[in-house]
């Protein structure tokens, strides 16, 4: 039998429908792969008993012809999504052994459609990071290595566990979240596909909040088709989330293979940053050539406020985080460190519970929201955000269907290599991705090539609001031209 963990999600779905194997066999193969790959530290909690029970129930539904769209397909869930009765910590000490009494809307919809829970995936603490090194469970290791080197590389962040697990064959797909690039950057670093949908497309209910006006859930998968299949189940209106948009969810898979002839693709001149590596520039041109060969028209566009996006993002996001994280005080749930009085208990709990990067962002956020600096920083950043959104609106109003950019300024870097002395060095990883969150737009990262050391590189496509279909059609053109990217297994 084929190695079941090497199948795409679509292939596994079709194999189950043909009864080539059972959901239990598929799940057991993934559980064995997870056990053999613990060195990657992708999972922070494995749920084998629950997975097998869900797989058996899926096999019964398949047998009686009542299969859902994801019936029997084993997935990993980022540890930011509440899973009822299954420990959810946001990879922070402050949540301790917290076991949610409810299920996040996104994961509930996956289970409704028949998916199987393999376990909870590692992420940067409270999703704050670009390398998955801030998790209280330790860093995630990228399954990719530089040619001729055994140095451990980061998988990107904050959804590093999701990206690493998908790339290494430890699940058929995974949930992830994206606040400033946390789906697209890890996807680019691991040779996987990641889509951040339009803000409001997927419910945020039951997802641990980082920055509420920027956070959005989405899938990481091995192929564009797989991402389309997963997003259809994850998306949809939810009355429990006031920012959820009540729009019908299209059949995203139907966009795969659709012609892109005549589409206008914007190439933004502002994304040609100083010091951009030649191989990223060459990859960008290659991607544009592939889309042109498929019948798309390339046009240069201007997004003049791009240069202000990163500083504005690192004001807005920490400001919202400082407010959201005020709820973690040790009183009603999570870890508690006692003190002589309640104020001391708050202080002790937060001092011991939060990691260094989370504390840094809470401090930045509290500072920019303080009376003396609110107008100078926070208010100004929100005005910049409006201008960034307007840049995109003007671009799309000229008939541009999507915008093509690099996904990251480099390939994956080594664990411990960046951001030690200067956090800004790490923040610069988000330079191509934050504009999408600031404007609330959909963006997809698709693997498009390798660097000189054999590491995957990704391209990003940015779409009009709620036009994820077009991103899937264009993304598949790049995927077909570039081919699939699979790391050489060194860990088992």
From Swiss-Prot:
It holds the Pfam family Amidase. Coiled coil: none annotated. InterPro entries: Amidase (IPR000120), Amidase_CS (IPR020556), Amidase_dom (IPR023631), AS_sf (IPR036928), GatA (IPR004412). One of its GO terms (cellular component) is glutamyl-tRNA(Gln) amidotransferase complex. One of its GO terms (molecular function) is glutaminyl-tRNA synthase (glutamine-hydrolyzing) activity. The keyword Membrane does not apply. One of its GO terms (biological process) is translation. The keyword Ligase applies. It comes from the Bacteria. Its EC number is 6.3.5.7. The active site is at 78 (charge relay system), 158 (charge relay system), 182 (acyl-ester intermediate). Keywords: ATP-binding, Ligase, Nucleotide-binding, Protein biosynthesis. It catalyses: L-glutamyl-tRNA(Gln) + L-glutamine + ATP + H2O = L-glutaminyl-tRNA(Gln) + L-glutamate + ADP + phosphate + H(+). Allows the formation of correctly charged Gln-tRNA(Gln) through the transamidation of misacylated Glu-tRNA(Gln) in organisms which lack glutaminyl-tRNA synthetase. The reaction takes place in the presence of glutamine and ATP through an activated gamma-phospho-Glu-tRNA(Gln). Heterotrimer of A, B and C subunits. Belongs to the amidase family. GatA subfamily. NCBIfam families: gatA. This is Glutamyl-tRNA(Gln) amidotransferase subunit A.
